[in-house]
């Protein structure tokens, strides 16, 4: 799976975490492992321009998704035909996300991880225009994010055990 991140926002973010959470969400949704994703981080002005151009809504927003190929969950690698190769583009605005994070009382890193999962789900056809769609999408988004955090915690614990084991062997 190829995930490219381009940061034109002027804000330093942990790009590796964005790739990790995107990769996790894509795999958890059974998207073909050959799928490609592009992520771009932009400033408020660029996001406001995209928001007006594509959604006809004024002002910036936190995340926008631009699907390329029609993908659906369940595109297992053992399927008879390979899935499409380009999942699409996710555009994030870290400055807008920072304001949301502060209002919600959590870190920018958490907000960007949440928005990355949100963007992946939009690329897969999930929406939140109707109340039932919103409940389904947000529940799935929260579960994926929680599962990713649990995976990260386990990886950290495993690496600490490995470090202790190496020190013991020396």
Curated annotation (Swiss-Prot):
Transport recorded as keyword: no
GO MF annotation, one: RNA endonuclease activity
Binding site for Zn(2+): 118, 122, 128
Cytoplasm keyword on record: yes
Cofactor(s) the record lists: Zn(2+)
Cofactor note: Binds 1 zinc ion.
GO cellular component: cytoplasm
Pfam family, one: YbeY
Compartment annotation: Cytoplasm
Keyword set, alphabetical order: Cytoplasm, Endonuclease, Hydrolase, Metal-binding, Nuclease, Ribosome biogenesis, rRNA processing, Zinc
Top-level EC class as recorded in UniProt: hydrolase
EC number: 3.1.-.-
Main location: cytoplasm
UniProt-listed GO biological process terms: rRNA processing
PANTHER family reported in the protein's UniProt record: ENDORIBONUCLEASE YBEY, CHLOROPLASTIC
Recorded family membership: Belongs to the endoribonuclease YbeY family.
Function: Single strand-specific metallo-endoribonuclease involved in late-stage 70S ribosome quality control and in maturation of the 3' terminus of the 16S rRNA.
Protein name, UniProt field: Endoribonuclease YbeY
Organism expressing this protein natively: Mycobacteroides abscessus (strain ATCC 19977 / DSM 44196 / CCUG 20993 / CIP 104536 / JCM 13569 / NCTC 13031 / TMC 1543 / L948)
Gene giving rise to this polypeptide: ybeY
């Amino acid at each position: 799976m190829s995930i490219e991140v381009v940061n034109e926002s002027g804000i330093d973010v942990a790009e590796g975490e964005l790739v990790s959470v995107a990769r996790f969400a894509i795999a958890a949704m059974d998207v073909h492992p050959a799928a490609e994703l592009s992520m771009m981080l932009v400033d408020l002005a660029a996001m406001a321009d995209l928001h007006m151009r594509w959604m006809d809504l004024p002002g910036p927003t936190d995340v926008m998704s631009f699907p390329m190929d029609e993908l659906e969950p369940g595109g297992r690698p053992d399927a008879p035909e390979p899935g499409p190769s380009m999942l699409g583009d996710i555009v994030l605005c870290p400055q807008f996300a920072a304001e949301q994070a502060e209002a919600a009382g959590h870190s920018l890193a958490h907000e960007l991880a949440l928005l990355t999962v949100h963007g992946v789900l939009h690329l897969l056809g999930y929406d939140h225009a109707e109340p039932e769609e919103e409940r389904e999408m947000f529940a799935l988004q929260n579960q994926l994010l929680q599962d990713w955090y649990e995976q990260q915690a386990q990886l950290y614990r495993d690496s600490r055990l490995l470090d202790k084991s190496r020190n013991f062997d020396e």
